């Protein structure tokens, strides 16, 4: 599983990893927001697509987990690559398999974005795994029942964020 940041920004490295995995019969999963399409000599076994919806927009004046203060330029860069439909469509078509893992913040607007994207990209409900929004254990515990209910009502799957439940706000674990 390759995750964190945007692994598909590193096309040469990803392609090299597909060679390594193919020679050994290893399945590669890449978790990506979909901002960059990468061709590889061997298709990636599973794309875990977690697009950035409007609820992911950084807030000016806050500090990122990496310690940077968010400014207008940071927000503009985020928005520039937030939803690259062309790259996402190519990624889902080119590689072997995928699932869609949107983060839901509990709002009607958030649900509308999740469903609009799913329909636009023609993603089946059984490939949709909704994750609760939140970056603390306490927030996730509040969100889990809401996400379970949403998934039951709409025919989606639910996936947790176990690393946050286990480690709360600790980084690099």
Which sequence ranges carry the predicted segments?
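Conserved AdoMet/S-adenosylmethionine-binding subsite of the radical SAM
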Residues: 8-173
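Glycine/small-residue-rich loop that forms an oxyanion/phosphate-binding "nest" at active or ligand-binding sites
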Residues: 1-2
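Short, charge-patterned binding micro-sites
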Residues: 5
